[in-house]
């Protein structure tokens, strides 16, 4: 029963967020071999000026080994790809 929570900078249209949710759900079903009834997706808009305090600090910096894809900004930035 996976539930995906996506936090994005506000300003995306509802159709774009729906497409994102549909694609994420489809990938989750494909990779984990799940039925669509098992997957749910929520999209949270975050004001850009609040991103570091509301998302980066509590969700990214404290994730430890759970953070499987690092961002390209902030203290935990991944090294540039060559």
Curated annotation (Swiss-Prot):
Family: Belongs to the 4-oxalocrotonate tautomerase family.
Recorded GO CC terms: cytoplasm
EC code: 5.3.2.-
Catalytic residue list: 2
InterPro entries: 4-OT-like_dom (IPR004370), Tautomerase/MIF_sf (IPR014347), Tautomerase_PptA (IPR017284)
Name used for this protein in its record: Probable tautomerase XF_1725
One Pfam family per UniProt: Tautomerase
Superkingdom, taxonomy of origin: Bacteria
Enzyme class, spelled out: isomerase
Originating organism: Xylella fastidiosa (strain 9a5c)
Swiss-Prot/TrEMBL keywords: Isomerase
MF terms (GO), sorted A to Z: intramolecular oxidoreductase activity, interconverting keto- and enol-groups
